[in-house]
Amino acid sequence: MKELVVLSSESHTLDGCDRVMLSGDQVIVQGKPGNRADLPGVRVPDDEVLSTVSVRVFLEAARALEQRLGQQ
């Protein structure tokens, strides 16, 4: 297994994810079970704590979030 690189650590809200870690070409998302993620591409299933998404999907979600925050 490749070394995990922590990209983000955010625990201030109940929505979204707590930890985002990069492992090769996959992003591992640690979230709060049962809560809705801010973006569907990084949603963690209700009965799981860890989920993976491709780097491409994660970057698309991050860019969409940046655009949304820039419009506020």
Predicted regions and their residues:
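Short, charged/polar N-terminal "headpieces" of proteins
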Residues: 1-17
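Compositionally biased amphipathic helical and low-complexity segments enriched in hydrophobic
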Residues: 5-8, 23, 70
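A short, structured beta-strand/loop element
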Residues: 13-52
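Mixed-charge, Lys/Arg-enriched low-complexity segments
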Residues: 42-72
